[in-house]
Amino acid sequence: MSWIILVIAGLLEVVWAVGLKYTHGFSRLTPSVITVTAMIVSLALLAWAMKSLPVGTAYAVWTGIGAVGAAITGIVLLGESANPMRLASLALIVLGIIGLKLSTH
């Protein structure tokens, strides 16, 4: 169950990371409320997952999901570049996340 909670926390990290772009420095109310809410819930779920997962593993997986998710969102929705080096780097992060999951008992 902790892994599911951690994945949800990571997905919410994507929401708030991308949401920051739309807040315009927290000057727009609706995107700001959504972003801050996603931040709070994401951190709360991360803390909950860390009760039974190793801190280093949980934090690395959380940030990895957020980084990969934000980068993919940027590529797909925001027209950011998807050059081979960037895609290979994202693949390495995903492999690291898988490795951390497989090495945690």
From Swiss-Prot:
Transmembrane stretches, start-end: 1-21, 29-49, 58-78, 82-102
Chain ranges on the Cytoplasmic side, renumbered to this chain: 22-28, 79-81
UniProt superkingdom: Bacteria
Periplasmic side: 50-57, 103-105
The UniProt record lists the keyword rRNA-binding: no
Protein name: Guanidinium exporter
Membrane topology label: Multi-pass membrane protein
Organism encoding this protein: Escherichia coli O6:H1 (strain CFT073 / ATCC 700928 / UPEC)
Alphabetically ordered keywords of this record: Cell inner membrane, Cell membrane, Ion transport, Membrane, Transmembrane, Transmembrane helix, Transport
Family label: Belongs to the drug/metabolite transporter (DMT) superfamily. Small multidrug resistance (SMR) (TC 2.A.7.1) family. Gdx/SugE subfamily.
Chief location: membrane
